[in-house]
């Protein structure tokens, strides 16, 4: 069974950029619901497999994608953030960003634009294209997981569902995007980058 991962910091640790109320609801209610619903869906899926009921298996796939994606995405998101975050990455990741986007500022602009531009709910991502050996920016709707739907390996995810920012930033998604750069955990993003290069 899947379980809700602990946050590596307190709910209030990302203040003033993301307030404690948002973090508490987002982690203990929203992410917890994805985990619970994923477990229920997987149980039903196992039953359908055991019975050889292909129709039931197909019917369960949207719930598997939505709740499984929600669990995968949020598990990455919490580690991508840190009260000691912000600034720029260092070393090989910074070099790769400059190579693939021209500069760190241009990369920030592109990922911000992709995230702000998501229609409705979804995610903005920095991913790694293993075949090309390149960093790429992508946007995914709803809880579609990056790797499962695009093949890109997720390095940095920005949640642009309204539950991620509305209580603090209301309908002004660009203000939330400006703020989140102050808490990006570049050490975590770099670890992910180095791991997928092996």
Swiss-Prot record:
Enzyme class: oxidoreductase
Keywords: Acetylation, Manganese, Metal-binding, Mitochondrion, Nitration, Oxidoreductase, Ubl conjugation
Location(s), subcellular: Mitochondrion matrix
Recorded catalytic activity of this chain's protein: 2 superoxide + 2 H(+) = H2O2 + O2
InterPro entries, per the entry: Fe/Mn_Superoxide_Dismutase, Mn/Fe_SOD, Mn/Fe_SOD_BS, Mn/Fe_SOD_C, Mn/Fe_SOD_N, Mn/Fe_SOD_N_sf, SOD_C_sf
Entry comment on modification after translation: Nitrated under oxidative stress. Nitration coupled with oxidation inhibits the catalytic activity.
Binding residue positions for Mn(2+): 26, 74, 159, 163
Function: Destroys superoxide anion radicals which are normally produced within the cells and which are toxic to biological systems.
Subunit composition and interactions: Homotetramer.
The family this protein is said to belong to: Belongs to the iron/manganese superoxide dismutase family.
Name by which UniProt lists this protein: Superoxide dismutase [Mn], mitochondrial
């Amino acid at each position: 069974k899947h379980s809700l991962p602990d946050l590596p910091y307190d709910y209030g640790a990302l203040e003033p950029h993301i307030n404690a109320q948002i973090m508490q609801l987002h982690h203990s209610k929203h992410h917890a619901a994805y985990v619970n619903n994923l477990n229920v869906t997987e149980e039903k899926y196992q039953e359908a497999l055991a019975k050889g009921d292909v129709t039931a298996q197909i019917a369960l796939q949207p719930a598997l994608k939505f709740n499984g994606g929600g669990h995968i995405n949020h598990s990455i998101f919490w580690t991508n953030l840190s009260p000691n975050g912000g600034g720029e990455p260092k070393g090989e990741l910074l070099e790769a960003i400059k190579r693939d986007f021209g500069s760190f500022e241009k990369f920030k602009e592109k990922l911000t634009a992709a995230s702000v531009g998501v229609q409705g709910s979804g995610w903005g991502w920095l991913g790694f294209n293993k075949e090309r050996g390149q960093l790429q920016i992508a946007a995914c709707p709803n809880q579609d997981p990056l790797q499962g739907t695009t093949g890109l390996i997720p390095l940095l995810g920005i949640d642009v569902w309204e539950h991620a920012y509305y209580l603090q930033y209301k309908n002004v998604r660009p203000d939330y995007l400006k703020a989140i750069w102050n808490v990006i955990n570049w050490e975590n993003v770099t670890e992910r980058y180095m791991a997928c290069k092996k």
